[in-house]
Amino acid sequence: MSKIIGIDLGTTNSCVTVLEGDEPKVIQNPEGSRTTPSVVAFKNGETQVGEVAKRQAITNPNTVQSIKRHMGTDYKVDIEGKSYTPQEISAMILQNLKNTAESYLGEKVDKAVITVPAYFNDAERQATKDAGKIAGLEVERIINEPTAAALAYGLDKTDKDEKVLVFDLGGGTFDVSILELGDGVFEVLSTAGDNKLGGDDFDQVIIDYLVAEFKKENGVDLSQDKMALQRLKDAAEKAKKDLSGVSQTQISLPFISAGENGPLHLEVNLTRSKFEELSDSLIRRTMEPTRQAMKDAGLTNSDIDEVILVGGSTRIPAVQEAVKKEIGKEPNKGVNPDEVVAMGAAIQGGVITGDVKDVVLLDVTPLSLGIEILGGRMNTLIERNTTIPTSKSQIYSTAVDNQPSVDVHVLQGERPMAADNKTLGRFQLTDIPPAERGKPQIEVTFDIDKNGIVNVTAKDLGTNKEQRITIQSSSSLSDEEIDRMVKDAEVNAEADKKRREEVDLRNEADSLVFQVEKTLTDLGENIGEEDKKSAEEKKDALKTALEGQDIEDIKSKKEELEKVIQELSAKVYEQAAQQQQQAQGANAGQNNDSTVEDAEFKEVKDDDKK
């Protein structure tokens, strides 16, 4: 079976891994980094992903960041006259990671396990799966990030029985999961979280503070300046990271704006205590889901054996301190918070291929599932934290006499009223025979698969007529849309390849022109006038071709110049060889000269010197 790669598709950074033997290995990207920024930029028809896209975000408005926050919604990004869905942008990041894995493995990769926040709903999970498909990946499994982290942490501890709390604060999402580990079984007991809380929010409180300070000092509102905001975002992210290691940091942004008297500069000294004050409400927001997960698992602090911190934002000292205070236990710092999730995904890939044995993963659904009933209430069929895959059925009936059809409104959430929960989908069961209300027997069945994706069936037990749907939210893509996006991705990949080849060809041709000019100068009088003229003509022809857009013309002119320079080099080499032979002949003649005399010498002993 071909390799299944593990991918942590993050809000801020992404990571790709593969199982080598029985150990997960993080694959470095072409820049040598173990994580890749989840950033996509568009410039002159070219798509850039990762570090190169992030570097030019300040000057390029067509740069997309933190797209994960929009997964499962109908959000669109309009760039250069074209609209992109979050699935398409995510697919570009996945395609980049896929290429990195293929370069490392030296073989085609078409299967992956992709991680998602535990608190992702059905629409967000389906969108992630669609993104994988667009990128040319068969998504073998969608796995929850805290579960993946526990898998990586506990793989070599299968002989222990432990209850582990995974606190996962990433770039844009927050999850907390509690798992029980023992005898190779990884069972999720509960999960809770907030999909709108992460490192981006910690950056934002610093940005807001800098904007307020600058406005107070200079009367200029930087929040209205896009380029200034991007510079502030980069500076805030750097300051946040700095304050994990030092107690204060200097934020210096020269020429950030201009006033009546000339350029304005931003200079702010930010202390760790000030940052903690600014971000206090965010840290407090992480505590409620933590308490909820503990309550749902039926555990007390003394039951928790280990606390694992996952996600780059858990490096913030105030976050670590808050977790320690809440659980009463020092967090385990033996795992890399940026890589552990992707490593767990690779292990899950190994479980699927059979390379990892005696490991069983029992995950849960993060939110309750049900349907709307009379009075606009939600009737729950599957409670949150139910182990998946699972199936649950319930009998319903009609609300009025002779009702010919029933509308099934599928919901996900914890609120009692249907309107307060998320609509996953709607469908209709028709042709119900006329009967008094309450008589027809309508069986509604919910199925949740191993990826946490929902299927719903409604069946009239009187006629055995059945209606079944896989939940499609308003943001879900049809098969036709996915196929079109797959083709677009393939075409773009081919176009990007051609563009790279064109750039390489132009660079090689440019280098050849420089090399020929240098060679002609170095040879000077040692080259015939005719040969020199031929080389000059071919060189000028290539320079002219480089000014145009005809790639084939550049290629042929380059080949012609290469041929001339090879012939020229051969002639110069022959001349040099002849000159060397003549020089050796002259030296040999000098060695046979009759004027050479033998010298006599007399040995002088030490005694003779006295």
From Swiss-Prot:
Bias (Low complexity) ranges: 576-592
GO biological process: chaperone cofactor-dependent protein refolding; protein refolding
Residue list for modification Phosphothreonine: T173
Alphabetic keyword roster: ATP-binding, Chaperone, Nucleotide-binding, Phosphoprotein, Stress response
GO molecular-function term, one example from the UniProt record: heat shock protein binding
Basic and acidic residues: compositionally biased ranges: 529-542, 599-610
Induction (UniProt): By stress conditions e.g. heat shock.
Domain of life: Bacteria
Chain spans, region Disordered: 525-544, 576-610
Function: Acts as a chaperone.
Family according to the record: Belongs to the heat shock protein 70 family.
Name this polypeptide is given: Chaperone protein DnaK
The species this protein was found in: Staphylococcus aureus (strain NCTC 8325 / PS 47)
